[in-house]
Swiss-Prot record:
CDD domains: FGGY_EcGK_like. It comes from Shewanella baltica (strain OS223). This is Glycerol kinase. Key enzyme in the regulation of glycerol uptake and metabolism. Catalyzes the phosphorylation of glycerol to yield sn-glycerol 3-phosphate. Inhibited by fructose 1,6-bisphosphate (FBP).
Length: 494
């Protein structure tokens, strides 16, 4: 039977999804299932790895059944995933020895402080491109080995395996035959040397993690093994894998140096491809691994904003200013400007490029004339201002002045926000027709790996832009508005 489709498994922080794409990169079918968030202690976040697998495997069955697609028609399955989340399981049984420790979990802060005391902060920064932070997988692994009974002894005997979620899914799909990750996920463990593209022995030693625990690192665009849907039907190749933000970068076809995308979700993630050069950031950004036009390793600068769409949720849930996120565009457009109002949404501190955990949210410039519309508009503008902060930091680090910014995520449906983003950055903003760019990136990698598509050039002909947003304010206005934002940020940090 002719291979007509590629399936992307998009395993996220709150839900597992499966999306079927046809040869023209159109979405044919989508299935999604949420799973349980576990908070056993303050600052701790866990998932049940078996529930993740159950949700992901069920949507895979469902998405094909819903569209009436037979496994014979599927060329490949690609994977994209929440990054950093850590699973350790028994090699012999496939049984997890503990819940998955989620990227948001802060329990390994003390381990990070111990590494800093050993003088490893600069080594981590130089060799992994990351900050020494509990966000990343390495200290989570150590916590499990130190705190789960018999775990360290089992690990020393080579009886345990570690994986981020991509690795766990491939292991389950291939029925325990394949233990593998890709460079984009390996680069988020804080154990991977991004220059030699190998596991870093010094960091493994510092954290007392046996090398036998770790998966083999294979290219993001390659075949890892085969699977059968629910154990039935024809074998399908499992091929193509990348962490969620790098998958979105590839899905937007940002495969050349200087190309960038911004994902507007709960927070914002801005990534710029820097080609074959790992650019060290002096402005609070991370250096990480991306995927090049032929599936090879490229590098990227990455910056994250904590409060993007979450700011709009705050307007709705805490202030009651709107009923639905989509209402913000209507109210923001009812006023010509914010009337001097700035909202700095530092509710959990400030992310890149400031990295100030002690900053707190504030509204500035309120007068008797300020109303709901001004505050809503200021909230939307804060998302664009924070993204400009990241973009300016990337320009300083890379020496590249961006001319076009590709965007994706839920908030890109807001035309007001996208136009203001173009205005305040003086950069053309491009919104794609298919905004499921994370899943699309996984599908592209899988399809290229098995020859379903021939090259990135072919994919470029399938990528359609829904709307171009052209900068529409002058330099003087732009400078005045941004100076007001910078002043507001400085005051939240005072």
């Amino acid at each position: 039977m002719q291979k007509k489709y590629v399936v992307a498994l998009d395993q996220g922080t709150t839900s597992s999804r499966a999306i079927v794409f046809d040869h023209d990169a159109n979405i044919v079918s989508v299935s999604q299932r949420e799973f349980t968030q576990l908070y056993p202690n303050p600052g701790w976040v866990e998932h049940d790895p078996m529930e993740i697998w159950a949700s992901q495997s069920s949507v895979l069955v469902e998405v094909l059944a819903r569209a009436g697609i037979h496994s014979d028609e599927v060329a490949a399955i690609g994977i994209t995933n929440q990054r950093e989340t850590t699973v350790i399981w028994e090699k012999a049984t496939g049984k997890p020895i503990y819940n998955a420790i989620v990227w948001q979990c802060r329990r390994s802060s003390e381990i990070c402080e111990q590494l800093k005391a050993q003088g490893l902060e600069e080594y981590v920064r130089e060799n992994t491109g990351l900050l020494l932070d509990p966000y990343f997988s390495g200290t989570k692994i150590k916590w499990i080995l130190d705190n789960v009974p018999n775990a360290r002894a089992q690990a020393e005997r080579g009886e345990l395996l570690f994986g981020t979620i991509d690795t766990w899914l491939v292991w389950k799909l291939t029925e325990g035959k394949v233990h593998v990750t890709d460079p984009t996920n390996a680069a988020r463990t804080m154990l991977f040397n991004i220059h030699s593209l190998t596991w870093d022995n010094k960091l493994l030693e510092a954290l007392d993690i046996p090398l036998s625990l770790l998966p083999e690192v294979k290219p993001s665009c390659s075949v890892y093994g085969t699977t059968r849907i629910a154990g039935e039907g024809s074998e399908i190749q499992v091929a193509g894998m990348a962490g969620d933000q790098q998958a979105a970068l590839f899905g937007q076809l940002c495969v050349e140096p200087g190309m960038a995308k911004n994902t507007y979700g709960t927070g914002c993630f801005l990534l710029m491809n820097t080609g074959t050069k790992a650019v060290r950031s002096n402005h609070g950004l991370l250096t990480t691994v991306a995927v090049g036009p032929k599936g090879e390793v490229n590098y990227a600068l990455e910056g994250s904003v904590f409060m993007g769409g979450a700011t709009i949720q705050w307007l709705r849930d805490e202030l009651g200013l709107i009923r639905d996120a989509s209402d913000t565009e209507y109210f923001a457009s009812k006023v010509a400007d914010t009337n001097g109002v700035y909202l700095v949404p530092a509710f959990v501190g400030l992310g890149a490029p400031y990295w100030d955990p002690n900053a707190r949210g504030a509204l500035f410039g309120l007068t008797r004339g300020a109303n709901r519309n001004h505050i809503i508009r200021a909230a939307l503008e804060s998302i664009a201002y924070q993204s400009k902060d990241l973009l300016d930091a990337m320009t300083k680090d890379s020496g590249v002045s961006l001319k076009r910014l590709k965007v994706d995520g839920g908030a890109v449906a807001n035309d007001f926000l996208m136009q203001f983003q173009a205005d305040i950055t003086d950069v053309e903003v491009l919104r794609p027709s298919v905004c499921e760019t994370t899943a699309l990136g996984a599908a592209f990698l899988a399809g290229l790996a098995v020859g379903f598509w021939e090259s990135v050039i072919e994919l470029e002909h399938k990528a359609c832009i829904d709307k171009h947003f052209i900068p529409n304010i002058d330099a003087e206005n732009r400078g005045r508005l941004y100076a007001g934002w910078q002043d507001a940020v400085a005051r939240t940090r005072a």
